[in-house]
UniProtKB/Swiss-Prot annotation:
SUPFAM superfamilies: PEP carboxykinase N-terminal domain, PEP carboxykinase-like
Subcellular compartments: Cytoplasm
Molecular-function GO terms, alphabetical: ATP binding; metal ion binding; phosphoenolpyruvate carboxykinase (ATP) activity
Cofactor names: Mn(2+)
Single GO cellular component term: cytosol
Catalytic activity from the UniProt record: oxaloacetate + ATP = phosphoenolpyruvate + ADP + CO2
EC class: lyase
The protein's name in its UniProt record: Phosphoenolpyruvate carboxykinase (ATP)
Residues reported in the UniProt entry to bind Mn(2+): 206, 225, 263
Binding-site residues, substrate: 59, 200, 206, 327
Keyword Manganese: yes
Amino acid sequence: MANVDLTKYGITGTTEIVHNPSYETLFEEETKAGLEGYEVGKETELGAVNVMTGIYTGRSPKDKYIVMDENSKDTVWWNTPEYPNDNHPMKEDVWATVKDLAKKELCNKKLFVVDAFCGANKDTRMAVRFIVEVAWQAHFVTNMFIQPSAEELENFEPDFVVYNASKAKVENYKELGLNSETCVAFNITSKEQVIINTWYGGEMKKGMFSMMNYYLPLKGIASMHCSANADMNGENTAIFFGLSGTGKTTLSTDPKRLLIGDDEHGWDDNGVFNFEGGCYAKVIGLDKESEPDIYNAIRRDALLENVTVADDGKIDFEDKSVTENTRVSYPINHITNIVKPVSSAPAAKNVIFLSADAFGVLPPVSILTPEQTQYYFLSGFTAKLAGTERGITEPTPTFSACFGQAFLELHPTKYAAELVKKMEKSGAKAYLVNTGWNGTGKRITIKDTRGIIDAILSGDILNAPTKKIPMFDFEVPTELPGVDSGILDPRDTYADASEWEAKAKDLAERFNKNFVKYTTNEAGKALVAAGPQL
């Protein structure tokens, strides 16, 4: 094991360094007597440990900063009042202050250092060193990142360093021009991240995802917020993009296929690869019967977050009194059907965009042209039904660039261009799959959606007769094996087709209005014609 010298980072007086602890050591450290506050880990009936993260039960997007310097000023997709995103600029002197604050917090203490990889491809992976003072934070990154072999650990040289000072606060934040006492800051040039005053584990996971989203596309590698799977031979790769609630995890966890990963992937000349070594699943309302894979993954070495646990260790997955964003992290080998030994597979043949359309307009499946692929990828659309005060349910649209706007560091058109380049090279086809509602007022059944996914993966959809849907110019199949053909043209699900037309016009206008922000460069302007035409 490499000798870890923290003095080169300005961290001095360390009383003990626990370097890449075993799961046994982590369990002992996070459940031992004498821990206080959010350091405490509680053993549960399933063997997994549960921890609480305080007021931050999710990411803190208003407190995310990137240092603006010569390297980043012209490459990062900066937050602007006109087109807001999470990339707030930070001055170099403010960075020096917050980094110093984090280092001071970590001095003169027992520390945990976890060296791990982000990225399953050895050529482009990032070697990351996490320096934390809390045992369960070391456990979290041990679960979520790819663990080095003994030999790799011996010669480990980090490309990137993360300082987690969750116990510190930026007390003079107003003077520094920051949003609050909490700060999650990145320096792209020095390759460092600082976390202050938030205990949420996901800041470390999504922090590294954001950084992969910066470095990889600049090397010509597609970086994607998606799940991915392959057939039982580890071939016929499929990628599933989709925002929360669209079925990304459900549809990629398929008993007939092998999981590559559930959230973050790259696509280079060798194929598709996972960034992670674990999964971070939502567990609110988790049911053993409907999601057995996730339920069975919650055992010793898994780490629950913000779940309600009784004194006797009994878990209440229904309780959302702390947060709806209750989570579990576990190493990917807790899932049986996975691609082994490395979470990677050949170039994708099928790319699926999942949208849950609450407007009832989009077809259950559309075969996209390359231009439509870029347009709908940039749009990143889904919609949910939100109750209004009179009990009427109104659809609320969400447009999130590339189905992952919160984690994009470059202009969204860069991600779209890289994805299409890779698709053209592998001959991949893209599909827009609506897992939402239609004119019946009911959600499209999971049986029909699975039938559609099966037809895409088998290639049957390419042999099906098709027709065009007006306004959107979508090509849709008129029949597919195992799918109710009465739903394939959404107009057929309305008693009166003019009702679909009115809703379609409304949704088309929303797409067009949202897309204006991408027309600030030539790549974006060229795609307007691929969107809805009124």
